[in-house]
Structure formats: C-alpha cells, structure tokens
Amino acid sequence: MAQEILVLGAGMVGTCTALELRLRGHSVTLLDRRAPGQETSYGNAGVIQREAVEPYAMPRDWAALLAVALKRGLDVNYHLSGLLAAWPQLLRYWRASAPARHRLIGRQYAGLIAHCTSEHERLMELAGAQDLLRRDGLRLIYRSERALDAALAHAGRLTQEHGIRFAALDGRALAAAEPAFRLPLAGAVHWLESCNVSDPGELVERYAALFRQRGGRLLLGDANSLRPAGAGWQAESREGPVQAQQVVLALGPWAGDFARRLGYRWPLFVKRGYHRHYRGGATLNTTTLDAERGYVLAPQRRGLRITSGAEIARLDAPPTPRQLLGAETEARQLLELGEAVEAQPWLGSRPCSADMKPLIGAAPRHPGLWINCGHGHQGFTLGPASARLLADLIEGGTPYTEAEAFAPLRFGR
C-alpha cells in the first residue's frame, strides 16, 4: 500500500532511500538544506568497498594507541575538545573492537556489504550513471615487507571467510602496474571486486535526478523543523509545509544531535576528513591506499584526489588539515603530484556509531519515524543496500538481508 513518506537528508544514504521508496510506488519527498550530494557524500574517495566486510576497529595494542595519542601518524588526528565530548562513545567503540566481539560484528556487517556493488549497479543502470563507474578495484600499497606479510595474511583470512577476491603483488609487479611510483615498495594487496566512482557527488546527483524523473519531490528546507502533526509528521520547506505519514531520518553526521532532541541517546559520534585535488602530475591507474601512511590517492574527474584519515573533533570545530598536508608531503615523494586545484582543503564529517554498524530501522518510541544513519566510512558504499533494507522494513515485508543487527533498538528505547 502506497504511503506518504518524507526523507530528511539528501546525501548518498538519504537520496538512495528516497529513490528506493519511490521506485516501489510510494509518494516521497526528499528534504535537505542543500542540493543532493553536497555534504559528506561529495568528499569521499569514491570507492564502493566490496572488500570492507569488517568495519574499522579501534587499535587494541598500546603502541598504536600511543602513536595516536602523540599524533605521530597521519591516519588519526584529534582535537582535545572533540575527544572529551566523544569519550563515552569512544569507550564503547574500544569495547566493540575486542577481537571476539569485532568478529561477530564483522559477520553481521558482511551480510550488508555483500550487496553493495550489485545494489549500486542496479541504480546506476536506471540512472544512466555507468559512465562514472570503474571496475578496477582498490589497491593497498605497503612500504615494508613486515606490513605486507601481515596484510596478505589478513586478506587471506577475509577471502576464506567471505569469498572476496584479491591479488597479491610483489614490488616488481606493483612497479609494473603503477609506473608512476618512484619509490621502491614492498608490494600491494589489490582487492578486485571493489569499484571506483570518478565523481561521488555527481553520482548522488544522478540518483536524485532519477528520483525526480520518477515523480519524487525534492525540496529545500530545514530538517530541524520536523514535528508531529496529527497521525503523521510535518516539516517546513521553502515552498511551505510538508506532511507525511512516515519520515526517515538520514541526516548523516547531524543525526546524533537531531536524535537527542527526540530523547534518544544513541552512541553516535563524528569522524572528520579532508580532501584536495591535484592536476598536472603523473597518471595513477587505480585508487590506492598508502596503508602505512594513512591516506588515499583517487583518480577522479577533478584531478587526483587525496583523502585524509580520520579526525576526532566537534562537528563545527575550525579546520585543522594537518593530516592532509602531511599526506601531500608523502604523496609527493611517491609520485609526481602536480599542483593543488583548491586554495583550501575540503572538510566533511562521517557519522559513526560506537559498534561500527549503521542504524537502520524503526525509532523505538516514535511510530512512523525511521532511521538510516551511522554508516561511518561506508555511507557511500552502503547507500543503496541500506536503502533497500529500510524500504523492506517500512513496507513490513521480509528483509532481503539480516535486519535485527542494525536496528536502533539495540541501543535501548
């Protein structure tokens, strides 16, 4: 039975949710303060990470934690104010990263990740967006033999447990695959089933265009205006009030504050990240993670995009692009980088949950309120797959993959 549904948030997750529901015949309005794909979804590395069957765990060894505390590497940075504000969530993150618990979380997470590529491909075909997709995998490069050996052992375990494919490259094979690299490297793990998108923001725009073509409404407005109205909900747009029977909260890094106003204390926190494009340098054939340095090099339409590691900071804290500047220094040693396109780095935020799994399902105390947020590093990857899962739940049918593990109710009422 068709319903009136309002989706708050036009990033990858929200746009895919609105599109999936509209494709199923529901009357759907997508509301955001900006055009689709202009916030978090614009700024990632553009990788659909089929290999990400286990979410990123917090380091458990004290040497790694000390390196983070002393800011010795580029993979993690923090503001003290942000660290203190997120301390309860980070403690829960630490506990969830214990090996046995993380292995269980990984098995649950893998059930959703398994559909990430096929679900994107389904929507890309409908949206005519195949020109943005490259099926060339994700390459993780290593500078030391010790790190490479550990990575190969880890990749072998993931292949055995989840069936995902990879290729092992020694230093000579890596040099042949990427002639632009001018440093001797130990080798690489090349995940073969991951895909790359040459313009992440453009892909969200294509999905939004398909949503409109199929009869969906896209409006500019303030999600904070949402309030109960009769048997449903109402929010304010620039064109006037919008009413719906059901509402989906897909506000990315802003979801935690919004949920707290409704009385929910879900353990959500923010990891910020930076990027910048470079042109006029060497050609890189495949998106590459410099694994021992903590940054990504992604060939994209605007140039070679460098994306930074994670920064624990308040959502509205001033930019501190230490990681990106350090990544640029490392990248210039690795290959001819060219000149920066933007005068200042881009800054965005990832919405993370303490147990590393997204929240997908019904809000426990508010009938008609649905949640699709907290995807961490994988909102871009999981947008279509989590949209399909939530649509199954809204319609009351049998979910196409496990749903209970992602229910907001796991954090209590």
Question: What residue ranges belong to the model's regions?
Answer:
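N-terminal Rossmann-like FAD-binding beta1-loop-alpha1 element of flavoenzymes
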Residues: 3-30
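Glycine-rich FAD pyrophosphate-binding loop
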Residues: 23-43
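Rossmann-like flavin
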Residues: 87-209
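A conserved short coil-to-beta-strand element within the FAD-binding core of flavoproteins
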Residues: 169-177, 219-233
